[in-house]
Every structure is written in C-alpha cells, then in structure tokens.
C-alpha cells in the first residue's frame, strides 16, 4: 500500500484554507443579527410622506429635514454602527461618490444609533464628510420603520466579541438596531426611492441611487 505524503508547504495550505473558512464563518455568525419575531419592520414605501426630524450632526450643526428639502433632495442612509465592516465599506463608497451625488442637487445624510464618540470612529474608518446624525432614542429610525429589537442571544454573542451594543448606543432596557435602509426624499417631502432588505450584507449600487436622483 502506497501512502501519500503531504509536504510541509501542502500542509500549510490545507491549514490556511481551513482557518480562512472558519474565520469567514465566524464573521457571518457574528454580524448576522436576526430580526425579532415580535417586531419585523417593513420600512416606509414609495410615495409615503417622509417624517420630519431634527438632530445634531458631527459638526455640531442642527439639521432639520424640512429645511434641508427646501434646497435639495435628501439621500437618507441608516446604518448599524462602526463595528460593522459592511456598513463601513458602504459608507466609504458613498463618500467616494459624494461629488456625483452633489451634482444631482442632493444632500447625503446618514443616521446611526451609536453615540457621538462612536460616530467619530465611523468617520475615522470611512473618511465620511457628509452629515451623520446620532438618533438618540431611535426616534428617526422608528418613524421610518427600520428599527428592530435585538434578541438576547445576539446581544450575548456580540458581548463575547467585545462589542457592547448597549454601551455603544446608550440603550438600557432594550437594544435596537436599524435595518440598513436607504430612502431618497423629494423636495415635496415624499419618498421617491427606497432600498430595504433585512439582509445586512445587501446594499444598492451607488449608481442606482444616482439614477433615482431627479
């Protein structure tokens, strides 16, 4: 009987491939937060009236939707937090495309459940120069029907990975996150485009947003 010997380099490749698969599975499990069975948001639909809101951005400037819409369309982006590589990647893509968005007479506004000190971390990771709002008490996210309660199992899993959602968001009794949704709002305060998918890995191409800015 002939025995097949695995060389050191071959063994290294096998181990490397296995570790890569395990790492990929860990990331998938870690960042997969399922929606609570009791609360499954659907998001607002096209032609819905966009709820007005006001909040302070990272520059200390108070921003009100109704006032902003007097001069421009608004691309409203909801994201989960600086701990999410999927959010950071997309926010960076939006920053890179910001000049194109501005040529469409539109303003980009991002909304996060995270406290200001964590929004600073988002900016460091993405170079975002557009307004990012801290949605204290989830008022904006609930108004746009994108907020969902995070289940205890997911909260524990994140804590085991040194991600404390309660501390990051300043939430106590219940922990909420948004579905990473996007709305385009017309000057008439109506929603003319929406992207809403509970799968946190899916985001629309920036070109799709540009095509709907009119």
Residue ranges and their predicted role:
Residues 200-213:
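A short, polar/charged loop-to-alpha-helix boundary motif
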Residues 68-94:
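Short active-site neighborhood of thiol/selenol oxidoreductases, capturing the structured segment around
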Residues 35-52:
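N-proximal helix/coil linker or "cap" segments that precede and/or mark the start of modular domains
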Residues 54-73:
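A short beta-strand-turn-helix
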Residues 23-34:
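Bacterial N-terminal signal peptides
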Residues 137-200:
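Thiol/selenol-based redox catalytic cores and closely related redox-interacting motifs
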Residues 89-145, 149:
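Structural microenvironment flanking redox-active thiols in thiol-disulfide oxidoreductases
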């Amino acid at each position: 009987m002939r025995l097949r010997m695995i060389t050191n380099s071959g063994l290294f490749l096998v181990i490397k491939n296995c570790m890569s698969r395990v790492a990929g599975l860990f990331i998938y499990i870690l960042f997969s937060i399922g929606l609570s069975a009791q609360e499954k948001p659907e998001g607002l639909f096209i032609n819905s009236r966009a709820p007005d809101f006001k909040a302070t951005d990272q520059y200390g400037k108070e921003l009100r939707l109704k006032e902003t819409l007097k001069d421009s369309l608004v691309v409203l982006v909801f994201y989960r937090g600086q701990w999410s590589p999927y959010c950071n990647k997309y926010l960076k893509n939006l920053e890179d495309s910001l000049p194109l968005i501005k040529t469409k007479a539109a303003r980009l506004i991002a909304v996060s459940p995270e406290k200001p000190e964590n929004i600073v971390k988002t900016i460091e990771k993405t170079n975002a120069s557009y307004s990012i709002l801290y949605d204290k008490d989830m008022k904006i996210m609930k108004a746009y029907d994108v907020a969902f309660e995070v289940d205890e199992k997911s909260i524990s899993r994140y804590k085991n990975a040194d991600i404390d959602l309660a501390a990051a968001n300043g939430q106590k009794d219940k922990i909420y996150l948004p579905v990473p949704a996007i709305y385009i709002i017309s000057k008439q305060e109506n929603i003319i485009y929406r992207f809403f998918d509970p799968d946190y890995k899916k985001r629309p191409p920036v070109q799709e947003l540009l095509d709907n800015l009119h």
